[in-house]
């Protein structure tokens, strides 16, 4: 059996996958769709598993997103496809290149390990997100700036992506667990590891979301209070500025009546 790993597939890669390996075109198109949800499908002799994995971008507006990782396999090939350059996949390839070969591992074991790796990378990126939250919080304690608030808003979007994808991966894992029989104690232990890491990632993501939501509400209250203070000061200044005008008006009226 051969493992084929493809990132950012070219036109030649697509031709190889669809024409040479005969992978169903629908599977390939689903992997290309960034919004595709995790699931399991079978067509002809191919089994298709779609998993959501975390991805760190260079876009400040969406620093962390999630993207599809497609796993397509039959008795001869185990193919992984993603349209993004993913740290997870490089880490996974390095792991197997130093420890074991693909021939030594069955499909269920590999898929569970991809699940495990995805959860681990979610946790790694969540730690980076936590650091960004703390840095933005420290900056906001000194002075509330639009840039820092925008940073928190962008992080909040990333956490929404993480929460949604982690829940979808959890549903996929339970579905996979119910459809596939665990063969031995090692696979049972691996499945437990996957469930533990996935639950930890889900809980951590929710905690950070709640913390960030509370922070945003607090800063919104601070901004509102500051605005009220400014409006009161402006009102006071306006009243003070009106006093000379009022006196002049009264004096002018008295002069007119005297004449």
Predicted regions and their residues:
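Hydrophobic alpha-helical transmembrane segments and their immediately adjacent juxtamembrane loops
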Residues: 16, 22, 199-259
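Peripheral, non-transmembrane regulatory/ligand-interaction domains of membrane transport proteins
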Residues: 1-180, 184, 190-193, 197-202
């Amino acid at each position: 059996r051969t493992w084929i790993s493809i990132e950012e597939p070219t036109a030649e890669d697509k031709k190889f996958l669809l024409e040479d390996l005969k992978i169903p075109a629908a599977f390939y198109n689903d992997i290309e769709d960034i919004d595709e949800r995790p699931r399991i499908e079978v067509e002809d002799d191919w089994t298709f598993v779609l998993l959501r994995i975390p991805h760190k971008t260079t876009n400040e507006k969406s620093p962390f997103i999630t993207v599809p990782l497609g796993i397509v396999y039959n008795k001869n090939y185990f193919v992984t496809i993603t349209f993004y350059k993913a740290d997870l996949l490089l880490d996974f390839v390095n792991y197997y290149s130093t420890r074991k070969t693909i021939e030594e591992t069955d499909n269920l074991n590999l898929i569970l390990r991809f699940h495990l790796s995805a959860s681990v990378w979610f946790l790694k990126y969540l730690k980076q997100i936590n650091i960004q939250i703390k840095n933005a919080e420290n900056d906001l304690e000194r002075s509330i700036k639009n840039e820092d608030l925008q940073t928190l808003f962008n992080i909040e979007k990333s956490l929404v992506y993480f929460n949604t994808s982690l829940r979808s991966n959890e549903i996929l894992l339970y579905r996979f667990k119910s459809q596939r029989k665990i063969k031995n104690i090692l696979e049972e232990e691996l499945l437990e590891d996957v469930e533990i890491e996935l639950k930890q990632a889900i809980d951590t993501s929710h905690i950070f979301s709640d913390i960030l939501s509370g922070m945003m509400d607090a800063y919104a209250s601070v901004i509102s209070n500051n605005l009220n203070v400014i409006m009161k000061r402006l009102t006071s200044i306006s009243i003070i500025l009106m006093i000379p005008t009022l006196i002049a008006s009264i004096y002018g009226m008295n002069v007119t009546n005297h004449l």
